[in-house]
């Protein structure tokens, strides 16, 4: 079993839900990411999603776009993100790390380092899962096999508009968990309709037999608690970015820890 599968199995045995915070790698300071990841774990995170900065992030709302632009300006690319994961792994060998991003940086990395280099290097760095927003499941079988060969799960997004056929395609190649995008549109947008999420999850579970995480639009502990009643995991990203984007270096980790502790407490209530 993968580290992600182990984590979900352990949580399910205790009747708990996974807390999955997201942050753009290298934001808001290029050297802060490993410390921020350790803070997230201390606050109760079960899995960490690290955003790989990209210049044209079509699924990201303005908050995460801006974070990505800042990280890119600081010189953060895929190679630097893998180095951050390596650094995190020096002190943590148990918390799963998922890279979330777009096809272009992966393809550029492979052009530079050779075919299969991404899966190899991500596995060596200690990455557990990869979510590539613009890789369709029907074209991913080889990529999924490459990742599996290095112990890495391939994670997919599902949306309110996803058809049964799409869910079946995802179910064939996905592992670890699937990420249900609870709003139409981009990350961090609009208010979350928890009743609509609750209605959708049984449809997803008809086809997908791995855990389902829900994200996009979860901004506070109360919403996380409501989603945690029906989903296997709660993903929070834009809100964390907003909380830390204008903070001085010495406050970033503490602010994140305080916020996530409140969410963890609500999820466990």
From Swiss-Prot:
Instruction: Supply one GO molecular-function term.
Output: tryptophan synthase activity
Give the record's GO CC terms.
cytosol
InterPro entries, alphabetically?
Answer: Aldolase_TIM (IPR013785), RibuloseP-bd_barrel (IPR011060), Trp_synthase_alpha_AS (IPR018204), Trp_synthase_suA (IPR002028)
Residues of the active site are 49, 60
Catalysed reactions listed for this entry: (1S,2R)-1-C-(indol-3-yl)glycerol 3-phosphate + L-serine = D-glyceraldehyde 3-phosphate + L-tryptophan + H2O
Q: Does the keyword Lyase apply?
A: yes
User: Per the UniProt record, which EC number(s) apply here?
Assistant: 4.2.1.20
Pfam families associated with the record: Trp_syntA (PF00290)
Listed A to Z, the keywords are:
Amino-acid biosynthesis, Aromatic amino acid biosynthesis, Lyase, Tryptophan biosynthesis
Pathway annotation: Amino-acid biosynthesis; L-tryptophan biosynthesis; L-tryptophan from chorismate: step 5/5
- Keyword Amino-acid biosynthesis part of the UniProt annotation: yes
Query: Subunit structure, per the record?
Result: Tetramer of two alpha and two beta chains.
Q: Which family does it belong to?
A: Belongs to the TrpA family.
**What's its job?**
The alpha subunit is responsible for the aldol cleavage of indoleglycerol phosphate to indole and glyceraldehyde 3-phosphate.
Q: What is this protein called?
A: Tryptophan synthase alpha chain
Organism equals: Acidovorax ebreus (strain TPSY)
């Amino acid at each position: 079993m993968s580290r992600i599968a182990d984590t979900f199995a352990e949580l399910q045995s205790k009747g708990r839900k996974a807390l999955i915070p997201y942050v753009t790698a290298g934001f808001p300071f290029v050297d802060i990411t490993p410390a921020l990841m350790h803070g997230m774990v201390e606050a109760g995170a079960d899995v960490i999603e690290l955003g790989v900065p990209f210049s044209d992030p079509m699924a990201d709302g303005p908050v995460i776009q801006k974070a990505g632009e800042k990280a890119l300006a600081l010189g953060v690319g895929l190679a630097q993100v893998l180095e951050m994961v390596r650094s995190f792994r020096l002190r943590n060998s148990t918390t799963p790390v998922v890279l979330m991003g777009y096809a272009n940086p992966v393809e550029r990395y492979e052009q530079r380092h050779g075919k299969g280099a991404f899966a190899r290097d991500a596995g060596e760095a200690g990455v557990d899962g990869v979510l590539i927003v613009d890789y369709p499941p029907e074209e991913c079988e080889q990529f999924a096999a490459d990742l599996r060969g290095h112990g890495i799960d391939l994670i997919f997004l599902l949306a309110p508009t996803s058809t049964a056929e799409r869910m079946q395609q995802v179910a064939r190649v996905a592992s670890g968990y699937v990420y249900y995008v609870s709003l139409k549109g981009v990350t961090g947008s609009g208010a979350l309709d928890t009743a609509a999420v609750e209605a959708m999850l049984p449809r997803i579970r008809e086809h997908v037999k791995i855990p389902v995480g829900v994200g996009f639009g979860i901004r506070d502990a109360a919403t996380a608690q409501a989603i945690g009643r029906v989903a296997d995991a709660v993903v929070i990203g834009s809100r964390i970015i907003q909380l830390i984007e204008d903070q001085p270096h010495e406050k970033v980790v503490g602010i994140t820890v305080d916020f996530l502790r409140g969410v963890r407490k609500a999820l466990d209530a």
